[in-house]
């Protein structure tokens, strides 16, 4: 192997003293915003040029780009939403950079284009994010995302004429969209950032506002805020019948909430008076819906794997009552449709859906198509139908329409594929981690490879954090890897939400090392089980999963042939200094508290690189407008990797422009990025594209 000559990166002399330990941070200057710091911008340009030169020489890149493009080229639909007689849904013909939004007058009406984000920006990096029609379908409230940023602009469309109203809301972020009749809506926003701080300033003082249609944002009414606790976040939802608004407050990313209610029928007398419902930030409360003054919630209060409870606020002495008790599976969420409840569960990281009466009595299970992920089941009281989606590793999303009276489902929108899903095998294995805990893992490969028992280059993916469950889903990029003869493995690590609160708690704060041990054990299992050869294992993870990749590469560099750390949290001593990073203390701890500092210092990827050790080939990927995990994390980590003597394998960084943490990325950019990553991983695991 010929050594790679990396661009030169200036080393600064920054040294912090934290709890008696001197911590060098020579690349602190790379935290500066690429838009305002010419030195950082020049560094990004040099690094991208070097990485581009390497990736373009890889013999399999063009073939991967061709196959990913072909695999993405199928018509796909979003789950329809009904409002009045109108049905709203998104559709992408295949290779459009952004999905379009359509409406039908009645289920079988002619589709009419309402919103085409592809016309918004020449580089297609402005995307339609969330959207919600008013209850009667007269208006459509939608949010616009630019350049991948978490900031949103809210706008309103008159559906009948297809014309936008003059209303425009700025500085919305992490917001629900909640109509109050058709007079206006509730939303959450932050104060406008200072000059030059749009993509880096810490997010404090989120508040809920009411916007009345036809008025300027400056006239919006403050609904709920906690100025004495600027660290708290607040969101608002409105029950389907419009009677109650529910304010959900949090202190971080952990699902421990306080709840307040606002009786919208008394607004002329009480204004936005919020009455406390749940206090203490101790448990998760997911609103199912409400009728009149009765509310239904999915909660882990006295039920680590969740149960369904209800309360009647109109009763003389309102009390919580249990409708559906905790089961062996993890209850994820619920909806009320017609006169029934649909509850969605996870069983070993795969979806189940059950229909109950409003009194909690079981009616029937919804038949899903094997191992996979279901989503949707939305609707209103009185609706005769609901729509849901189902997907798996080998099956792109199919939309189903379910008749609530008969319980029968029929396809509403099915993709036409350029591959045969039946050629692929999905297997779920359970392996023992370092401490003996059994951890589930999905393994996907061609049936012919599985039958032959042949070890092949394998891409192992993980996350392990923030109570987020990884479930089966289709990816054209992963399918291109499988088509080429590789295997894909998804490990359901501790720290995730696959098995309720205990599983999450076992992978956060002082238990974070369990996540890394689980991932390392997954790699060892794949090698020992003959799934992949030694020297054929690649790993990948994004965001918290990027941290995972960086940590395990430091701890076991010998185990992996290649690694792709995507938009990762790499400096665990400064993550809370930027944008939403301060929320993550629920999972990571506080860097300015000694006990937490010692834990973070021990695994922080940026601070634990091991000079003189042979490292795997590493491709770090990030984007210049990522204001969730700011790109400075990846910039500093890549600079430190390139400066250290870590062997001859490449350690490169790919920095996307006009993109963020992942959502809203144009199809063309996703294809190019996917081809770069697969070609890099294939080069160092020995995967040969057929």
Cite the ranges covered by each PLM segment.
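Non-catalytic accessory segments flanking enzyme active sites
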Residues: 38-133, 143, 232-290, 322, ...
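Hydrophobic beta-strand positions that form the internal "hydrophobic ladder"
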Residues: 87, 140, 185-186, 245, ...
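A flexible loop/linker signature enriched in serine peptidases of the S9 family
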Residues: 92-99, 121-125, 144-153, 168-173, ...
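Beta-propeller blade signature
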Residues: 103-104, 155-159, 202-214, 259-265, ...
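Blade-edge beta-strand/turn elements of extracellular beta-propeller
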Residues: 117, 159-171, 215-227, 265-278, ...
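Cap/lid segment of the alpha/beta-hydrolase catalytic domain
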Residues: 118-134, 143-149, 160-166, 402-408, ...
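Long hydrophobic segments that form regular secondary structure
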Residues: 226-306, 311-319, 324-329, 334, ...
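Active-site-proximal cap/loop segments of hydrolase catalytic domains
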Residues: 484, 490-690
């Amino acid at each position: 192997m010929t050594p790679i000559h990396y661009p030169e990166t200036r080393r600064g002399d920054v040294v912090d003293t934290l709890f008696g330990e001197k911590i060098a941070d020579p690349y602190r200057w790379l935290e500066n915003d690429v838009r305002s710091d010419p030195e950082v911008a020049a560094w990004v340009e040099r690094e991208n040029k070097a990485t581009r030169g390497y990736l373009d020489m890889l013999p399999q890149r063009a073939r991967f780009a061709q196959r990913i493009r072909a695999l993405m080229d199928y018509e796909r639909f979003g789950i329809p939403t009904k409002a009045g007689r109108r049905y709203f849904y998104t559709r992408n013909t295949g290779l459009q950079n952004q999905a379009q939004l359509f409406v039908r007058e009645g289920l079988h009406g002619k589709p009419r284009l309402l919103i085409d984000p592809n016309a918004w920006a020449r580089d297609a990096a402005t995307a339609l994010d969330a959207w919600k029609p008013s209850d009667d379908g007269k208006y459509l409230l939608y949010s616009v995302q630019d350049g991948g940023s978490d900031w949103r602009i809210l706008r309103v469309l008159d559906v009948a004429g297809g014309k936008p109203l003059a209303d425009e809301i700025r500085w919305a972020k992490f917001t629900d969209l909640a109509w109050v009749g058709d007079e206006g809506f509730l939303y959450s926003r932050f104060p406008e950032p200072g000059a030059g701080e749009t993509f880096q300033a810490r997010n404090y003082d989120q508040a809920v506002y009411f916007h009345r249609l036809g008025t300027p944002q400056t006239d919006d009414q403050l609904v709920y805020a906690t100025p004495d606790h600027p660290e708290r976040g607040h969101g608002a939802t409105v029950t389907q019948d419009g009677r109650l608004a529910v304010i959900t407050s949090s202190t971080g990313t952990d699902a421990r909430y306080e709840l307040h209610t606002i009786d919208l029928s008394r607004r002329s007398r009480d204004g936005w008076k919020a009455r406390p419902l749940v206090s203490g930030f101790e448990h998760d409360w997911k609103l199912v819906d409400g009728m009149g003054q009765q509310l239904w919630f999915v909660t882990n209060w006295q039920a680590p794997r969740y149960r369904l409870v209800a309360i009647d606020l109109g009763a003389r002495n309102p009390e919580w009552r249990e409708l559906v008790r905790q089961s062996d599976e993890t209850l994820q969420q619920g909806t009320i449709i017609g006169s029934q409840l649909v509850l969605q569960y996870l069983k070993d990281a795969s979806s189940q859906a059950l229909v109950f009466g409003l009194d909690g009595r079981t009616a029937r299970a919804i038949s899903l198509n094997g191992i996979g992920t279901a989503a949707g089941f939305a609707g209103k009281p009185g609706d005769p139908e609901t729509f849901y989606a189902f997907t798996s590793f080998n099956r792109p999303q199919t939309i189903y329409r379910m008749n609530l009276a008969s319980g029968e489902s029929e396809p509403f929108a099915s993709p036409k594929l350029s591959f045969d899903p039946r050629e692929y095998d999905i297997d779920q294995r359970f392996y023992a981690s370092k401490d003996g805990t059994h951890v589930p893992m999905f393994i996907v490969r061609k049936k012919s490879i599985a039958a032959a028992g042949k070890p092949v280059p394998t891409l192992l993916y993980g996350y392990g954090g923030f109570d987020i469950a990884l479930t089966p889903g289709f990816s054209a990029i992963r399918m291109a890897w499988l088509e080429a003869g590789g295997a894909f493995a998804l490990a359901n690590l501790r720290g995730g939400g696959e098995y309720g609160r205990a599983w999450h708690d076992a992978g956060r704060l002082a238990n974070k090392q369990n996540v890394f041990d689980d991932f390392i054990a997954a790699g060892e299992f794949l090698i020992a089980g003959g799934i992949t050869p030694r020297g054929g294992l690649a790993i990948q993870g994004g965001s918290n999963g990027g941290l995972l990749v960086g940590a395990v590469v430091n701890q076991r560099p010998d185990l992996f042939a290649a690694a792709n750390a995507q938009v990762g949290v790499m400096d665990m001593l400064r993550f809370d200094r930027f944008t939403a990073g301060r929320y993550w203390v629920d999972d990571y701890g506080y860097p300015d508290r000694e006990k937490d500092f010692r834990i973070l210092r021990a695994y922080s990827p940026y601070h634990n690189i091991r000079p003189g050790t042979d490292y795997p080939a590493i491709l770090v990927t990030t984007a210049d407008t990522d204001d969730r995990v700011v790109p400075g994390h990846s910039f500093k980590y890549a600079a430190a990797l390139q400066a250290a003597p870590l062997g001859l394998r490449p350690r490169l960084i790919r920095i996307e422009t006009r993109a963020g943490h992942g959502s809203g990325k144009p199809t063309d950019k996703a294809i190019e990025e996917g081809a770069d990553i697969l070609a890099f991983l294939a080069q160092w695991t020995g995967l040969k594209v057929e």
